[in-house]
Amino acid sequence: MRGSRRGEFRVAGRGRRYGQGAFWGDLVGPNPTDRAKNGVKRSILVEADGGPLSVVVAGANVPDFKLLEATLDGIVVDRPEPSEDTPEHLCLDKGYDKGAVVEEAVAVRGYTPHIRRIGEEKLDPAGNKRYPARRWVVERTLGWLSKCRAILVRYEKKASNYLGLIKVACILLWYRRQHRLSLLR
């Protein structure tokens, strides 16, 4: 059924515009970079190859460093104990540069933190990259998850349902990865 204004479509019995999500439930907040529209932030922890290990959902206005502990505690697989020979590294971007609070939360869980400091140059004086940035691994995983239509636009009112869909998509990513590796053997 066509609405009264140009570009507005209505579904019988509902007053939504085309392109809007169906509901806005819990764990939704105003996005500080998108004219304060409601949005969802997905904090995700991935391994070195991009396999998702933990996912946490919050409102778009929640800072990254406040979700760090919940993300690290949400790992669903048993991880090996770090040792002197095989330490576990955790690379974080500038959003986690909040001083001793973040470093302590990371160190308590047995990780060696690598936090890019605000204002820190990426290049050494000779112009060479000492440690190449690895944030693209997380961005690639978020891109893979965004291919799932139910995750890209949030239609669920309850955050637990939305988180469940994200976890199903993560399982699908692991399945595809395992299937691809089995074909190479």
Residue ranges and their predicted role:
Residues 10-19, 44-50, 68, 87-98, ...:
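Short, conserved catalytic/metal-binding motifs centered on acidic residues
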Residues 80-159:
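Helix-centered, glycine/charged polyanion-binding patches within enzymatic domains
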